[in-house]
Regions:
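N-terminal pre-Walker A segment at the start of P-loop NTPase domains
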Residues: 1-17
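Hydrophobic anchor at the beta1->P-loop junction of P-loop NTPases
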Residues: 25
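Conserved lysine of the Walker
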Residues: 33
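Hydrophobic positions on the alpha1 helix immediately C-terminal to the Walker A/P-loop
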Residues: 36, 40
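Short glycine-rich substrate-engagement loop in P-loop NTPases that contacts/grips substrate
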Residues: 55-90
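Structural recognition of the conserved hydrophobic beta-strand(s) that form the central parallel beta-sheet
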Residues: 93, 117-123, 147, 156
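Short regulatory helix/loop adjacent to the ATP-binding pocket of P-loop NTPases
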Residues: 109, 126-145, 157-163
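Interdomain hinge/linker elements that couple catalytic modules in large macromolecular machines
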Residues: 158-219
Length: 219
């Protein structure tokens, strides 16, 4: 389901910032990183090119001859035949960049080049898997980061179609320590109980909202 996420607005701020650098959206798996990055790119750029290193490992070959941006693009057209690269109008997504160390290193080249906005997702960045030392040349100073987690309580309320004015009223009451109405108290108490029971993972919330999904329903 298409949930409203705060990370989307943060990506808008990143895009509108002058001289922004490639951004890496980090976080646990299944929290919605890939979905929100793809949605943002498709809604804000004329063209989007996705390098999915997890499901298309052959794309790692695009970086086999170095980190020249034009050369990387030239190689990528061999494996992504429908890709369109237009300077300042194309967003490049590196999906699961932790699966391609060379792509991580190339971010410096893309940052210095400046013609393409690069967004990357990663679930295990900085983690030494199976005792193997990670030797990725991290381009210090040429990356920006966005930490993404499961839906927080406010995002959960959005997913439950809670009226925005009700959310603002309860936030104001909490800030000013003003008493809330009994109806508000009962409603938000119920929402808190649901949030504790369901959690903030997008798939779990989708299962609760959509009773037609072929999995058990929450009480």
């Amino acid at each position: 389901m298409d949930f409203k996420r705060k990370a989307y607005d943060q990506l808008i701020q990143w895009k509108n910032k002058k001289n922004h650098k490639p951004i890496i959206v980090k976080g646990l798996r299944q929290v919605g990183k890939s979905y929100i990055v793809s949605k943002f790119a498709k809604e804000n750029y004329e063209h989007v090119v996705i390098f999915d290193f997890r499901h298309q490992p052959i794309l790692r070959k695009c970086f086999s001859s170095g980190y020249d941006v034009d050369q990387i693009i030239s190689y990528s057209k061999v494996y992504l035949s429908d890709s369109v690269f237009v300077p300042y109008k194309t967003a490049i997504i590196f999906e699961e960049i932790n699966d391609c160390e060379e792509a991580r290193t190339s971010l410096k080249a893309f940052a210095l080049d400046g013609r393409y906005d690069v967004l990357a997702t990663g679930s295990l960045l900085g983690v030494n898997r199976y005792g193997r030392e990670k030797k990725t040349a991290i381009p210090t100073g040429y990356e920006e980061y966005l930490e993404m987690s499961s839906l927080d309580f406010e995002e959960f309320l959005w997913a439950m179609n809670t009226p925005l004015d009700a959310i603002e009223n309860i936030k104001k009451s909490l800030t000013t320590l003003q008493e809330i109405t009994p109806s508000y108290h009962e409603y938000f108490k119920e929402m808190i109980i649901r949030y504790i029971a369901i959690g903030g993972m997008p798939d779990a919330i989708s299962a609760f909202i959509n009773p037609n999904l072929p999995i058990f329903r929450y009480a």
